[in-house]
């Protein structure tokens, strides 16, 4: 199969996908209500789409094409409110977060869809362990070559995205000591990691052709890269975010991506190289493990510094581009929380420290998602 042509899109437009938990309201464990939720959601006129995911206790929602983080928030608000109405009818709840804190993977059931069944056959128990929940952000690119350039520039900021969105400290009832344990499940897949260092679409097509000839991949969907091109949309897709506990944070993260993209396009601040990836895996691990307390190694200089400091410096540096994109408020939110060392993983741990019961933590997280005070 040849690679699809890179379609035109308006530069810096956004699209956001959120994978969400469906839980019962008895003990707040995962509940197999995806089919019922999809049926109820289909009756409501909404932007974007609502689709099944790998197992039947999760769904994915997505916005349409948006021009700003505030437009993302507006669409997510409509979708969230419809989700809450539908869930209330079923006596269940919808929750954010990158992992469910105490679900048991072996109890999950693969959603009855051919691709999911094929993946289950291929990956075995990994498929059920893939009951994890991420946010994906698409950003429009001027052309195919510009998309690859933006992809590799964004790769320097993967640790920032991970730490700001981290919301998966608990797995099967245990504190993992990671802020983002979700990504450990992604890393188990053979085609995860980072995209190859090619900066022209012609070279990327050649790479894709080689991979398809091996029989290892059939389409771009087979790559579980941290960032991958989406030629059918004319975007790149950033895939390392945990699903936040609130749609406000999800929208703010998309605004951060857009502001970075605006900086890249306006100033062409650096040319990516293979050497950027010498510290890529280390930086990614640090962000997953320690979140806002991580160490960041600057790929250009080799300087070691607190990741939190680099996040603050980055937000300050792109502030004028955030003004142009209307993202100043969103970046102020992220900056203030980063300065305080706050992310959703810390919120979850604070709730567990206070409550000593993960079911109660999940209940309070459900309240946060629906916009009510926890």
Curated annotation (Swiss-Prot):
Catalytic activity annotation: L-cysteine + L-glutamate + ATP = gamma-L-glutamyl-L-cysteine + ADP + phosphate + H(+)
Keyword flag Membrane: no
GO biological process: modified amino acid biosynthetic process
Matches recorded under Gene3D superfamilies: 3.30.590.20
Signal sequence coordinates: none
UniProt keyword list: ATP-binding, Ligase, Nucleotide-binding
Enzyme class, first EC level, given as a word: ligase
EC number(s) on file: 6.3.2.2
GO terms assigned for molecular function: ATP binding; glutamate-cysteine ligase activity
Pfam families: GCS2 (PF04107)
Physiological role: ATP-dependent carboxylate-amine ligase which exhibits weak glutamate--cysteine ligase activity.
HAMAP family from the UniProt entry: Glu_cys_ligase_2
Protein name (record): Putative glutamate--cysteine ligase 2
Organism per entry: Paracidovorax citrulli (strain AAC00-1)
């Amino acid at each position: 199969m040849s690679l699809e042509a890179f379609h035109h899109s308006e530069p810096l437009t956004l699209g956001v996908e959120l994978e969400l938990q469906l839980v019962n309201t008895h003990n707040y464990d995962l509940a197999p209500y995806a089919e019922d939720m999809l049926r109820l959601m289909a009756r409501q006129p909404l932007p974007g789409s609502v689709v099944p995911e790998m197992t039947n206790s999760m769904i994915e929602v997505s916005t349409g094409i948006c021009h700003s983080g505030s437009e993302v928030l507006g669409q997510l608000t409509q979708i969230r409110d419809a989700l809450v109405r539908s869930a209330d009818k079923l006596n269940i709840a919808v929750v954010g977060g990158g992992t469910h804190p105490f679900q048991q993977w072996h109890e999950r059931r693969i959603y009855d869809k051919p691709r999911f069944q094929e993946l289950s056959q291929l990956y075995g128990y990994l498929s059920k362990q893939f009951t994890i929940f991420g946010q994906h952000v698409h950003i429009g690119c001027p052309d195919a070559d510009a998309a690859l350039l933006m992809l590799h520039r964004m790769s320097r900021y993967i640790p920032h995205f991970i730490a700001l969105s981290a919301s998966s400290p608990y797995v099967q009832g245990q504190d993992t000591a990671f802020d983002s344990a979700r990504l450990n499940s992604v890393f188990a897949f053979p085609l995860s990691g980072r995209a190859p260092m090619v900066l022209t679409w012609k070279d990327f097509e050649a790479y894709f052709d080689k991979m398809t000839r091996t029989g290892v991949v059939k389409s771009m969907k087979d790559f579980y890269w941290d960032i991958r091109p989406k030629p059918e949309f004319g975007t790149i897709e950033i895939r390392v975010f945990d699903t936040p506990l609130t749609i406000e944070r999800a929208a703010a993260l998309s605004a951060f991506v857009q502001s970075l993209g605006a900086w890249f396009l306006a100033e062409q601040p650096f040319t990516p190289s293979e050497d950027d990836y010498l510290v890529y895996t280390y930086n990614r691990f640090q962000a997953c493990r320690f979140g806002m307390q991580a160490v960041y190694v600057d790929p250009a200089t080799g300087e070691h510094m607190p990741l939190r400091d680099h996040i603050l410096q980055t937000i300050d540096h792109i502030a004028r581009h955030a003004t142009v994109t209307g993202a100043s408020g969103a970046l102020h939110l992220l900056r203030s929380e980063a300065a305080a060392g706050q992310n959703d993983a810390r919120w979850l741990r604070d709730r567990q420290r206070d409550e000593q019961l993960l079911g109660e933590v999940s209940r309070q997280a459900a309240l946060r998602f629906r916009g009510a005070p926890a």
